[in-house]
Amino acid sequence: MASKFTIHVKSSYEELWRYNIVLVCELCNAKGERIDYLAEESFIAAVGSNLEVPPVDYSVDRTLRIATKEGDYINILVYVVPHTLPSTNDIVKTKPFSLVVKVENDKKESLVNQVFKINQWSGDNITLEKVGVTK
């Protein structure tokens, strides 16, 4: 059944400034055809920048949000790309951090509320397919 979708991507990790984040959403109809394509990006620095501290204008709240028009389901991609390596080379001190992806439909029903563990060294690519398809 057709619905509008809202996607939120966020993390409370204090060194999230070391990463660029891209949220991509493909809105599809019941036939599987793309009817819209949306993207939101939180870009801090070019890959390889190796910043010592966060940029002066860095905002701690880096929630990415996309609201779609009406469609039958969505496919979601989230890219977490490190531009600056962790502050230490100690593997024990650089455990994965949490990134939360939430999706609601226009009835405010939760379709996804998932925590992903992101490797501090490599970042991650998250794929969620056919969100909103009723079984």
Describe the residue ranges of each PLM region.
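Surface-exposed loop/edge segments in extracytoplasmic proteins
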Residues: 29-39, 107-114
